[in-house]
């Protein structure tokens, strides 16, 4: 490994490190962000969802543009956009600016994630050196995923929530310098053309759906605004499907979904990310807003999830090579559902049960992600593997975005329906009760200060904070039950239709990914799920 190769490895590894660091670091800062901008559950959902939404709508187009116009160029664009977005997040004067800046971070993250490994692969043409380089590259990225929650908690406790974004600035500057000076350009001369119409329709469809789901509990599911957005999403999706089926260079080749195994693998991976990212959002809020933990302690509490994914992931490939993909997928889904059920029934009990539940969720995710990738990539012809991998990447981001939106909205809807009636005995005055319920819901915090609204002498029978905490816990339980139910559906579908004989060698799978999309076989967007060892025959 010469000096240029080493610096290329550092530049690409640090870029991915930043992307993975931001996957979970924001969650522990949400209560502080809420207090700064006085926003409710919907505002917090936008802060976390806008990042994954930016990745979801742009990741496939970013890969095409990188293949067409140069991966180094688009890596620089991605890092620059991500770094500028981080600056804007840190300086944000309002929740709207913060949400927009998070979306810009997501767009930059999409470009970085689909170009990073391709640049490493181009810098190390010899097979053994390439394998060693990818191992180092994944190790650098893994550090970011496993330390994200803990580092985020420490930064928030010491310097406030804005510091979690400023930490990206020195790294971004270093990555830009190293890339400009040492990373060589590469591209794909056979790349397909950029599908602008498909990209725009995809943005409209996904964006309108996410907007309707997040804002629905606040503005009403039957409001004109919500109905218009739902219709916009439906029409946009229909037009997208119609256009992509007729395009000679589609952004998303929908004919791949004719294969039952591939379609089910995509549905499964989307559902896993839906459940897990929604769970992480709700668990973080529970630990800080209900249990009253500091950001630092919350970050440590989340660590078992990331650690379990990082530890189990490298071991799963060997298991797939020996017994196939079906059993690990189903076992992983069962373990993930068990972890969610443990979280559902652990709120009033010890923190140890929460830690065990998070560890089970992480182990379940790690156990099923690699075999899902195996099923998906062996179900398609080798010449279409890049497209298949890109769709899988987009569905991961879409799943996490919808998870933030749907499960957060379930909590908000539950509170809107139950909190005020449950406060009736504690706060008999209807005006005070309504105002108090609105404050608690809008602050997304059952510990919101109530003294100025309801004087202590007007409180009867029970403390409103205790009632609000119980409603928050019940709302989180309902949301996690929704996540568990969706996993149960894909588990039953997988039991029926997942193939029983998928044993794919790493060399065979790696040969299927010749484009910038190769990043998907080494890096999952799940925090902590970074690996480089492909399974043996």
From Swiss-Prot:
Main location (coarse class) = membrane
What InterPro entries has UniProt attached to this entry? EmrB-like (IPR004638), MFS (IPR011701), MFS_dom (IPR020846), MFS_trans_sf (IPR036259), Sugar_transporter_CS (IPR005829)
A single GO molecular-function term is: transmembrane transporter activity
What membrane topology does this protein have?
Answer: Multi-pass membrane protein
Specify the domain of life of the species encoding this protein. Answer: Bacteria
Membrane-crossing ranges are: 6-26, 46-66, 77-97, 104-124, 136-156, 163-183, 200-220, 223-243, 262-282, 300-320, 327-347, 352-372, 397-417, 478-498
Which SUPFAM superfamilies does the UniProt record give?
MFS general substrate transporter
> Per the record's keyword annotation, is Calcium included, yes or no?
no
Q: Which GO terms describe its cellular component?
A: plasma membrane
Q: Which Pfam families match?
A: MFS_1
Alphabetic keyword roster: Antibiotic resistance, Cell membrane, Membrane, Transmembrane, Transmembrane helix, Transport
Q: Could you list the residue ranges forming a coiled coil in this record?
A: none
One GO process term, biological-process aspect: response to antibiotic
Q: Does the keyword Transport apply?
A: yes
Localization annotation = Cell membrane
**Family from the record:** Belongs to the major facilitator superfamily. EmrB family.
Q: What is this protein called?
A: Multidrug resistance protein Stp
- This chain's source organism reads Mycobacterium tuberculosis (strain CDC 1551 / Oshkosh)
């Amino acid at each position: 490994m010469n000096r240029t190769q080493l610096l290329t490895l550092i530049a690409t590894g640090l870029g991915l490190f930043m992307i993975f660091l931001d996957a979970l670091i924001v969650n522990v800062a949400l209560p502080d962000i809420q207090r700064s901008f006085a926003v409710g559950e919907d505002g917090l959902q936008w802060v976390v969802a806008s990042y994954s939404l930016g990745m979801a709508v742009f990741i496939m187009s970013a890969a095409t543009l990188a293949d067409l116009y140069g991966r180094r160029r688009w890596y620089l664009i991605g890092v620059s956009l991500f770094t500028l977005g981080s600056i804007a997040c840190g300086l944000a004067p309002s929740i709207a600016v913060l949400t927009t800046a998070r979306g810009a971070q997501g767009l930059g993250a999409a470009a970085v994630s689909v170009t990073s490994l391709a640049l490493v692969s181009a810098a190390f043409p010899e097979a053994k050196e390439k394998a060693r380089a990818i191992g180092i590259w994944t190790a650098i990225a893994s550090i970011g995923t496993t330390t994200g929650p803990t580092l985020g908690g420490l930064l928030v406790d010491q310097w406030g929530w804005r510091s979690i974004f400023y930490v990206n600035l020195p790294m971004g500057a270093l990555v830009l310098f190293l890339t400009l000076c040492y990373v060589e350009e590469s591209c794909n001369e056979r790349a397909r053309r950029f599908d602008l119409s498909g990209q725009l329709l995809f943005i409209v469809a996904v964006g309108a759906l996410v907007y309707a789901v997040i804002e629905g509990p606040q503005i009403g599911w039957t409001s004109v605004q919500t109905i218009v957005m739902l219709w916009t999403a439906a029409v946009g999706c229909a037009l997208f499907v119609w256009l992509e089926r007729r395009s000679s260079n589609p952004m998303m080749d929908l004919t791949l979904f004719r294969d039952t195994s591939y379609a089910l693998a995509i549905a499964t991976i989307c559902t896993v990310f839906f459940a897990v990212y929604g769970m992480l959002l709700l668990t973080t809020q529970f630990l800080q807003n209900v249990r009253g933990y500091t950001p630092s302690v919350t970050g440590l509490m989340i660590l078992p999830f990331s650690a379990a994914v990082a530890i189990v992931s490298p071991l799963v490939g060997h298991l797939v090579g020996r017994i196939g993909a079906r059993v690990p997928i189903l076992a992983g889904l069962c373990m993930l559902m068990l972890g969610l059920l443990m979280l559902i029934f652990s709120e009033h009990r010890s923190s140890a049960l929460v830690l065990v539940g998070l560890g089970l969720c992480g182990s379940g995710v790690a156990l099923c992600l690699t075999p899902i990738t195996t099923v998906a990539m062996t179900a398609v012809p080798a010449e279409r593997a890049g497209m298949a991998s890109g769709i899988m990447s987009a569905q991961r981001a879409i799943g996490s975005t919808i998870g933030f939106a749907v499960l957060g909205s379930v909590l908000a809807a539950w509170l809107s329906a139950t909190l005020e009636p449950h406060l009736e005995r504690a706060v008999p005055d209807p005006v005070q009760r309504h105002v108090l319920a609105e404050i608690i819901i809008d602050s997304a915090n059952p510990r919101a200060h109530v003294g100025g609204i309801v004087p202590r002498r007007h409180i009867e029978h029970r403390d409103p904070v205790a009632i609000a905490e119980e409603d928050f816990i019940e709302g989180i339980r309902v949301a996690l039950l929704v996540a568990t139910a969706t996993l149960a559906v894909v588990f039953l579908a997988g039991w029926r239709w997942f193939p029983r004989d998928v044993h794919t060698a790493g060399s065979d799978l790696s040969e299927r990914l010749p484009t910038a999309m190769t990043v998907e076989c080494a890096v999952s967007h799940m925090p902590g799920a970074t690996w480089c060892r492909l399974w043996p025959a």
